[in-house]
Amino acid sequence: LLDAGVDMRFRTSCTQVLTEGDACMGVAVDGPDGPCEIRARQTVVATGRRGADWLDRMCREHGIAHRAGPVDIGVRVEVRNEVMETVNDVLYEGKLVGYPLPFKNKVRTFCQNPGGFVSQENYDGGLAVVNGHSYKERKSPNTNLAVLCSQNFSVPFDQPIAYAQKVGELTNMLGDGGILVQRFGDILDGKRTWDKELRQSNVAPTLADAVAGDITAAMPYRAMTNIVNFMLAVDEVVPGFAARETLLYSPELKFYSNRVDMDARFRTSVSGLLLGRFERVDARAHDGERDGRSGGQDHGRRALNRYDAAHTPFA
């Protein structure tokens, strides 16, 4: 890219899309050298998951035709490795999907990490969310994975990202700014988890600074009911998954960009503004680099190469 004359700017935030009438004229950015405007005949926006809130705001401010996308609200589940060995021995990352009663919303597992570690991530604005990863050499006695409930909104409320952020903020407030952890058995009993109980648990938390508490005090009823019933169903095929000692960390949130209306050449309703859809490719390449999985980075590079070959209009 540098050899082709591309100007790459690091530690620089895009603060605004510049429009005149129904046409995009460029963007405003803010970096180490201060704020400035970059004018262009064509502007490509490719924010990824972390910029979903920013993209939503730009769509509303500039009248960019879009529809609200889904948001995933859930928990990070941690069990002993032996509980998941029937899955881990066959698949590095098993995918389980269910539609539990009474709501029949889609609930799925995601980002399974055998011998992995639960971790904390901080989004812009200080929102603390839970995640998980694994290392090639260093292993724990536990397996962690996400259990996510997909939420869709339409009328009259159509701000799923803001909704999930509020869930995260409330959970952070109960956890004194950090991640909450609770034993599954305590959820079934309708009680919080205490530090002493956590220390005596057979499943030792790999996120040492997680705060023992009550995630049900912050999790919406619909999402919590879906998660509990899904885990009980999974326990039928993976015995021990819904054991009383199983740990649940919250909040695990996955933000997705709005579904911006665009044509086959990625053009939006605003002239000169194009949209790049790299979320899945970026996530897969990032996962390989983050957790040290064998071949992860090569997989990401192959995915990017396939994307380039299949989407020549973007060039």
Where in this protein do the model-derived segments appear?
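Residues forming the flavin
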Residues: 1-314
